[in-house]
Amino acid sequence: MEEVPRRQPGGLVEVEGVFQFYEDWECWDYVSQRVSDERLQRWLAMLTNNQLRRQVIREAQIWMWKHKGAAVRRNCGCRLCNPGWGSQVRNVEL
């Protein structure tokens, strides 16, 4: 039986950010279930601003490298399951 080819960092040509998207998603899925509530709420609030997305992923990667054996704290790290700072709709008066 053939083995599925594995992704190697920098070894494959990235097509329109597809590989980067999945790597970011896997990182977020892993980390968002394990970080403290305060850090998760901060990151969720930062994700409402598209310019801060790369910074959030970078911080998540650093956290993941430093805390390799971290225990799972929650089933889901999404904004719906973890309402807080980043969940409120912002009304802006112009």
From Swiss-Prot:
Subcellular location: Virion; Host nucleus
Pfam families: Lentiviral_Tat
Keywords, in A-Z order: Cell cycle, Host nucleus, Virion
Keyword Cell cycle belongs to the record: yes
Keyword field contains Plastid: no
GO cellular component labels: host cell nucleus; virion component
Main location: virion
InterPro entries to which the protein is assigned, alphabetical: Lentiviral_Vpr-like
Function: Seems to function as a Vpr-like protein, since it mediates host cell cycle arrest in G2 phase. Cell cycle arrest creates a favorable environment for maximizing viral expression and production.
Protein name: Probable Vpr-like protein
Gene it is expressed from: tat
